C-alpha cells in the first residue's frame, strides 16, 4: 500500500475547508477565546459519507493541523482531532471524510450540535 505524500495530504486538507472557513478557524484559534466551550460557534461540519462520524469544528491550530470541536462517533464529546488523520482516512468504498456543504457557518453552537 502506497503512503500518502505531503502534497497529497495538503490537497486533501484543502478539500475539507473553503478558504473563508479555514481563515475563520485559524482566527478563532489565534483569539484564544475564553468563552464557555459549548457556546462557541461551529465553523465547519465534516462527516464520514460511508458510516459513523461527524466533526463540528470551531478552531484550528495551523501549525499542527489539530482542530477543536465536537466529535460524534459512538459518543458525543468535546475535544481535539488531528486533521492529518481525517484526511488519510478511506472507507471500504474508498470514500474520504467530506465537508457538509449545507452546514451554516457560525450559526450553530457546539451545544446546538450536541442536541442534534
Task: Briefly describe each language-model feature range.
Residues 2-116:
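Catalytic phosphate/metal-binding cores of nucleic-acid and nucleotide-processing enzymes, i.e., regions
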Amino acid at each position: 500500500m502506497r503512503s500518502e505524500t505531503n502534497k497529497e495530504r495538503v490537497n486533501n486538507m484543502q478539500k475539507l475547508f473553503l478558504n473563508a472557513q479555514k481563515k475563520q478557524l485559524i482566527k478563532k484559534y489565534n483569539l484564544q477565546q475564553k468563552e464557555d466551550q459549548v457556546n462557541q460557534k461551529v465553523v465547519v461540519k465534516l462527516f464520514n459519507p460511508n458510516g459513523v462520524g461527524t466533526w463540528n469544528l470551531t478552531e484550528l491550530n495551523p501549525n499542527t493541523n489539530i482542530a477543536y470541536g465536537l466529535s460524534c462517533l459512538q459518543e458525543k464529546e468535546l475535544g481535539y482531532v488531528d486533521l492529518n488523520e481525517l484526511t488519510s482516512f478511506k472507507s471500504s468504498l474508498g470514500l474520504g471524510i467530506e465537508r457538509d456543504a449545507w452546514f451554516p457557518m457560525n450559526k450553530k453552537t457546539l451545544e446546538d450540535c450536541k442536541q442534534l
